[in-house]
C-alpha cells in the first residue's frame, strides 16, 4: 500500500488534446468531517450488511508503533466501536459482505488475514507463499502484496504479488482458505492495480511498465496485455455498463526516479497527474482527465455516474461525472488522502487520511466522512 494475445493501445497526442477539454475547476467545494483513528491506517471498506466501516491498521513504523488491528467504526460518528486485534500488520482490504468476511492483506508477511466481521474476530491467516533464500543468504519473501479483490459468487480472492523480477496474481479458494494458483506474467515491475470484471470473468492489473494485463478467471491465464501511454498506472476502477477502465496515473518524481534505476531503458511517456480512461476490450485510450497532484484511489458509483478520486499530494478528493468527465466537486482534506469506501444508500464517502510523519511520527491517521450531494 501494488501477464496470449497482445492488445494495441492508442498513442500519439490524442490523450493530451482531450485532457485540455476537461474543466479543472470544481463547481463546488464539499465539506468533510474527520476523526483521528490510529497510527498507520491504510485501506477501508464499508459494509452495508453490518452498517459499519472497517479500517486496516498497520500500527505504523515509528519508534513507538501502534498495534495492528482492524478498526470497526460507526459510519455516522466515526467512533471506534470495536478493535479486532491482528498478529500481522494490515494494509489492503477486500470485503465479501454477503459472507461476512473481510480479507486483509499483510504486505510484509505475504499473507492474508481472514476476519469474520459479524463476530469481530480473526478466522484464519492464509500464507500465500513462503520465504526463499535471498542474495545475502537469508530467507526472505520475494514479493510484496498490494491490492485484493473478491469474487463472492465464485468463492475466489485475487491478490497481486508484485516484484521487479516478475509480478504474480495469487488465486485463493475462499471456501478452503488456501492458494490454488499463482499466475505469473504480470510484468517484471511492481504491479499496483487490480480490479475484477465479475460478469466477464476477467481480472485487470496494472504495472510500472505502463501496462494493463488481463487475466481470464476461468483459464487462470493471461490473455491480453495493453501498453498504455502512462508511466505510473496505479489503482483501477471498472465500469461494467460501458466496459471502460479508469486508472490513476500518479506522476510522482520519487516513482519516476525508481523506474529510471530499476527498469532498463526506461523513458517517460507522460507526466501523469491524471485519470486515464481506456476501452477495457481493446486498451484504446478514450480520455485523459487532469486531476490534482498524486492521484491514487478511485471509486466508481455506476448508478449515479460519479467517479471519486483521492489526490495525496493535492490533499483533495475530486468528484467527476463519469460520463462527461467534468469535475463537479472537490473536497479539501489534510495531507494525505489515500483510500476510498462508499455507502451507496446514504451517498456518503469515507476516506483514509495519512498524517504527516516527517516531524515525529507520532501523529495518528484519520478517516474523513463526506456527505455527497
Language-model features and meaning:
Residues 9-373:
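Predominantly soluble domains enriched in secretory-pathway, periplasmic, or organellar proteins
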Residues 1-10:
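Gram-negative bacterial Sec-dependent N-terminal signal peptides
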Amino acid at each position: 500500500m501494488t501477464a496470449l494475445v497482445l492488445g494495441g493501445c492508442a498513442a500519439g497526442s490524442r490523450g493530451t488534446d482531450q485532457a485540455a477539454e476537461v474543466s479543472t475547476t470544481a463547481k463546488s467545494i464539499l465539506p468533510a468531517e474527520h476523526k483521528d483513528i490510529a497510527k498507520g491506517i491504510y485501506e477501508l471498506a464499508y459494509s452495508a450488511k453490518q452498517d459499519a466501516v472497517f479500517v486496516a491498521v498497520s500500527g505504523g513504523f515509528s519508534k513507538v508503533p501502534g498495534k495492528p488491528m482492524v478498526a470497526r467504526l460507526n459510519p455516522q460518528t466515526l467512533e471506534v466501536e470495536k478493535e479486532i486485534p491482528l498478529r500481522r500488520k494490515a494494509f489492503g482490504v477486500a470485503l465479501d459482505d454477503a459472507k461476512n468476511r473481510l480479507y486483509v492483506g499483510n504486505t510484509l508477511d505475504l499473507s492474508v488475514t481472514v476476519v469474520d466481521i459479524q463476530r469481530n474476530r480473526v478466522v484464519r491467516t492464509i500464507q500465500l507463499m513462503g520465504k526463499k533464500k535471498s542474495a545475502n543468504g537469508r530467507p526472505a519473501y520475494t514479493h510484496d502484496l498490494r491490492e485484493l479483490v473478491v469474487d463472492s459468487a465464485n468463492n475466489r480472492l485475487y491478490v497481486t504479488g508484485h516484484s521487479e523480477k516478475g509480478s504474480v496474481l495469487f488465486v485463493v479458494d475462499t471456501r478452503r482458505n488456501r492458494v490454488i494458483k499463482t499466475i505469473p506474467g504480470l510484468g517484471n515491475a511492481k504491479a499496483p492495480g487490480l480490479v475484477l470484471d465479475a460478469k466477464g470473468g476477467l481480472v485487470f492489473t496494472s504495472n510500472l511498465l505502463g501496462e494493463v494485463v488481463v487475466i481470464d478467471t476461468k483459464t487462470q491465464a493471461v490473455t491480453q496485455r495493453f501498453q498504455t501511454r502512462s508511466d505510473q498506472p496505479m489503482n483501477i476502477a471498472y465500469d461494467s455498463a460501458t466496459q471502460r477502465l479508469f486508472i490513476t496515473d500518479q506522476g510522482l518524481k520519487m516513482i519516476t526516479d525508481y523506474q529510471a534505476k530499476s527498469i532498463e531503458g526506461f523513458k517517460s511517456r507522460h507526466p501523469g497527474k491524471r485519470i486515464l480512461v481506456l476501452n477495457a476490450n481493446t486498451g484504446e485510450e478514450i480520455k485523459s482527465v487532469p486531476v490534482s497532484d498524486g492521484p491514487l484511489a478511485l471509486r466508481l458509483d455506476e448508478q449515479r455516474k460519479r467517479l471519486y478520486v483521492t489526490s495525496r499530494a493535492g490533499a483533495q478528493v475530486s468528484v467527476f461525472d463519469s460520463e462527461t468527465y467534468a469535475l463537479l466537486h472537490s473536497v479539501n482534506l489534510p495531507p494525505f488522502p489515500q483510500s476510498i469506501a462508499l455507502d451507496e444508500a446514504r451517498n456518503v464517502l469515507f476516506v483514509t487520511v495519512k498524517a504527516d510523519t516527517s516531524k515525529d511520527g507520532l501523529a495518528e491517521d484519520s478517516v474523513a466522512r463526506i456527505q455527497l450531494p
